[in-house]
């Protein structure tokens, strides 16, 4: 960590977790890579880059297509802006990145924005498929990917999602360890770690 160690307990002005539940018209919050979630994620990222330039930032998308849509949304929102600096002055090697769950290993940043990219299937149906997190082969592939994603932040994790994890009944999640761990992690972040 650049020869600096943040010891626990550390008094900071911001909690280490923040949950942004994206709401809106169903067509904007449903399906894979919901439009409203992409917009909200990039708004938060740009706000962080502008107002906290000392922090390095990354977005982790829970799918390849969702990562592509987030990159497009970032380009759209910054437009012709040339003054947006996307790395801390003292750490130019920690440039802002958007990665997906399967290619984030090895990258760390001060702040990680996790964008789940999975909205409800219909007005009355909760999504049960979460891409690579659904694969519990003998090596617990999905759980390992989730573990890598949630441990990339040095200071803070902010989750952006159309998923309200408290609407899920643990008994209806099936036997998949990764899927259950994902919903439990979302609950943990939404409660700010309590």
Placement of each model-derived feature along the sequence:
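Helicase C-terminal subdomain and adjacent C-terminal extension
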Residues: 12-19, 123-194
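Structural motif
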Residues: 58-60, 113-115, 150, 158
């Amino acid at each position: 960590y650049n020869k600096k160690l943040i010891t626990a307990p550390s008094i900071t002005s911001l909690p280490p977790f923040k949950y942004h539940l994206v709401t809106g018209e169903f067509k904007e919050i449903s399906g894979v890579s919901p439009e409203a979630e992409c917009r909200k994620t990039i708004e938060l990222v740009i706000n962080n880059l502008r107002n906290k330039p000392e922090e390095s930032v990354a977005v982790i998308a829970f799918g390849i297509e969702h990562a592509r849509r987030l990159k497009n949304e970032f380009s759209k929102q910054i437009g012709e802006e040339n003054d947006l600096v996307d790395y801390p002055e003292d750490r130019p090697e920690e440039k802002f990145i958007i990665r997906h769950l399967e290619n984030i290993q090895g990258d760390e940043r001060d702040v990680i924005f996790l964008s789940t990219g999975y909205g409800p299937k219909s007005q009355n149906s909760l999504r049960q498929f979460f891409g690579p997190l659904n694969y519990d082969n003998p090596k617990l592939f999905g759980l390992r990917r989730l573990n890598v994603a949630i441990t990339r932040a040095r200071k803070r994790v902010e989750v952006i999602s159309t998923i309200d994890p408290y609407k899920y009944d643990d008994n209806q999640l099936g036997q998949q360890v990764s899927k259950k761990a994902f919903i439990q992690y979302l609950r943990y972040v939404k409660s700010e770690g309590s």
